[in-house]
Design a protein with these regions (language model features):
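Bacterial Sec-dependent N-terminal signal peptides
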Residues: 1-24
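Long, internal stretches of domain cores in catalytic or enzyme-like folds
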Residues: 23-149
Length: 149
């Protein structure tokens, strides 16, 4: 009982500190710091299952499978739309942070968009960079011929 009382007291002592951490910073505070670089790591968005229609996995399950809009293991239309939203979010963040101007057209020395060589990864990167730099000619880089899993 004493231990629980101590933990609750400690929690109430820490709560005001944590709310300070979430406080909106003033413009004067923000002007002291300059964002110079950003690294964004991401995984592919929504993809169709690896198993195809007529696979052993489909045959042993008792329920009918959902009809996917994409081929096996490929990025879906919904996944592309969601990745586009991520690109819009990061575009706003990078403009607000002062790293890029609105409608920037960065050079290859300023931005590197790199994807794994799977179709779903390349497509994810394309949707993202299209929303991030809508007027820019940013290329998606990958090492190998696009493949499927």
């Amino acid at each position: 009982m004493n231990r629980n009382f101590f933990l609750v007291g400690l929690l109430f002592a820490i709560l005001p500190i944590s709310t300070f951490a979430q406080k909106q910073r003033s413009q004067a505070f923000k002007e002291k710091y300059i964002l110079k670089e950003a690294v964004i790591l991401s995984r592919h968005n929504i993809r169709a299952p690896l198993s195809t229609k007529g696979s052993l996995l489909e045959k042993v399950t008792t329920h009918p499978w959902f009809e996917w809009t994409a081929g096996a293991s490929e990025l879906t239309t919904r996944g592309g739309a969601l990745e586009n939203q991520f690109g819009l979010y990061f575009r706003k963040w990078l403009v607000d942070a002062g790293l890029f101007k609105e409608n920037a057209n960065p050079t290859t020395n300023e931005v590197n968009v790199y994807a794994n060589s799977m179709q779903r990864c390349i497509a994810t990167a394309n949707y993202f960079k299209t929303a991030l730099f809508p007027v820019g000619d940013v290329k998606v880089n990958h090492r190998f011929v696009p493949s499927k899993m």
